[in-house]
Amino acid sequence: MLHITEKEQTRGLRQLEKRGKRLLPPLIKFIWFCLISAACVAATTFYWLRLSPVHNIHKHSLNSSFEDKGEDGTLQLKHIFHHGVGEKDYKIHKRLDVTQEYLIKHSAYFQNMVNEQQQEVQEIQEIHKRHEKQEIQVKYGPDQEYNQTNTALNSVGTEYKSRLSTNEYDWPDVHRGKNPFDIQLPFKNKQSIARRIKHRNEPFFIESYLDYARSVNGDALILNRINLEWIDDDINIPNITDKDTIVTLATISSNAYVRFPQNDDDKKKSDWTDVGGGWIPDEENNDVNFGWEDVGLRGHIFVSKDNKTVVIGIKGTSGAGLPGGGSDETTKNDKTNDNLLFSCCCARVGYMWTTVCDCYEKAYTCNQDCLEKELRRKDRYYEAALDIYKNVTAIYPPETTDIWVTGHSLGGALASLLGRTYGLPTVAYEAPGEMLALKRLHLPQAPGLPRHLEHIWHIGNTADPIYMGVCNGASSSCSLGGYAMETACHTGYQCVYDVVTDYGWRVNLLNHRIHTVIDDIILVYNETAPCVYQAPCRDCFNWRFVSHDDKE
């Protein structure tokens, strides 16, 4: 029998201890290697899937945490204003009140709308599931099956994008299945100070100032002699660092595109109240339809439960030419006002173009007086926006109500101009540069206004060629559609989501859509975009604008 002494036993334990010390570090390294490898694989998979356009859309649109938050601190659609434009219809101005009786009257239409939206959601979810399945096969499938699977993936992606483009009710995916006419949208505000003209709401005061400013060609020395009285008002402004508030205002901008019910009674104007010049249907005009099918500008009015906050949502450009809305009924007048507001000279891009006014004189020379007169015509959208505001204030006194303005695309630019005119907080989405139009209109600007009192915010993304001011040139999508979008300079703050750098997006006109902004951008980012003041900027620098007073 082998006998081990205590001394030998101690020596053996020491040897085992030394051997353990030599073996332990490699074991720990192996364990750490496995953990790090697993983490890298998980992170890579998550990042790869996150970059997928389909994943981005449905991560927040079909399973979004953005929900209605009850009645407190919410906004709901209460009125729709329609203002006719054009030489024939610009005096027509009607208001539709979205009352409980109105909702009950058209309940069948709204229920059908909700049902069809829910069906669209289910169909898109099925496409999304097939897309995710193909994604996994592409990433982890055998090499010999890669080309076949990738082709299938592209096919599913094409089907998905095609399905999204048939959004019949022009409604964001995050709100699919909800009635646009009774949805309650949460918002947050914060206190601030607004410096604005004291007598701005007196009848014809603003119009008289603008007419005089145009008559003196905006001469600052002459205008300063008027000594406009500016005051600092304590107001509530939208909290633009709150994502729900940004989504709410974007939804209001989108809501202005939504179709609403029209039947024989609507065509007889039974639901509309005349707030204009007493227009009455007659034998020559009894076929005029208000709302979406008629030419003109529309404003959707959302009101808080306590009636202390009112938001005016101005409809933007309709039609396939500039995606944003889904229908073509108002495309002609939208295009005219787009080309008037955002081109250097009446959309005189080339000799083949049809201009929207007669201000062009010769090569890169334009009549400034003519341009300013065209913008102030009563049948243009800017004047229509002023009338909508005045009719809103007839219901909700501006002395006791916080009035905000929002809009998308053309609607966003008009919202900014309206906000500048009356000193209203404004949040514009993907609006073309409106600084040139502001100068041509000679809108009043508070002297020595600190930047922290600037309440104009432009929400945009770097993949939108219209917002970035690059949708021009002979081969651009805008030019091919007949739009002369030549401006890039905005006023106020710019809050830009850099989707090109962050997600590898390419500049594409489809990224101008308000639905893309809501579903694929704002809701995807964890925080709202940082806002910076507009850097020095000048549009149409190669043009010469002459006045009748100029001596050549």
Swiss-Prot record:
Gene3D superfamilies according to UniProt: alpha/beta hydrolase
Topology Lumenal: residue spans: 50-552
Bilayer topology annotation: Single-pass type II membrane protein
Keyword tRNA processing: no
GO cellular component: multivesicular body membrane; vacuolar lumen
Active-site residues annotated for this sequence: 409
GO biological process: multivesicular body membrane disassembly; neutral lipid catabolic process; phosphatidylserine catabolic process; piecemeal microautophagy of the nucleus
Sorted UniProt keywords: Autophagy, Endosome, Glycoprotein, Hydrolase, Lipid degradation, Lipid metabolism, Membrane, Signal-anchor, Transmembrane, Transmembrane helix
Cellular location(s): Endosome, Multivesicular body membrane; Prevacuolar compartment membrane
Database matches in InterPro entries: AB_hydrolase_fold, ATG15_Lipase, Fungal_lipase-type
Enzymatic class: hydrolase
Glycosylation sites (chain numbering): 63, 147, 239, 307, 391, 526
Pfam families named among the record's database cross-references: Lipase_3
A molecular-function term among this protein's GO annotations: triacylglycerol lipase activity
Catalytic activity reported: a triacylglycerol + H2O = a diacylglycerol + a fatty acid + H(+)
PROSITE patterns: LIPASE_SER
Similarity field: Belongs to the AB hydrolase superfamily. Lipase family.
Functional description taken from the UniProt entry: Lipase which is essential for lysis of subvacuolar cytoplasm to vacuole targeted bodies and intravacuolar autophagic bodies. Involved in the lysis of intravacuolar multivesicular body (MVB) vesicles. The intravacuolar membrane disintegration by ATG15 is critical to life span extension.
Protein's name according to its UniProt entry: Putative lipase ATG15
Annotated organism of origin: Lodderomyces elongisporus (strain ATCC 11503 / CBS 2605 / JCM 1781 / NBRC 1676 / NRRL YB-4239) (Yeast)
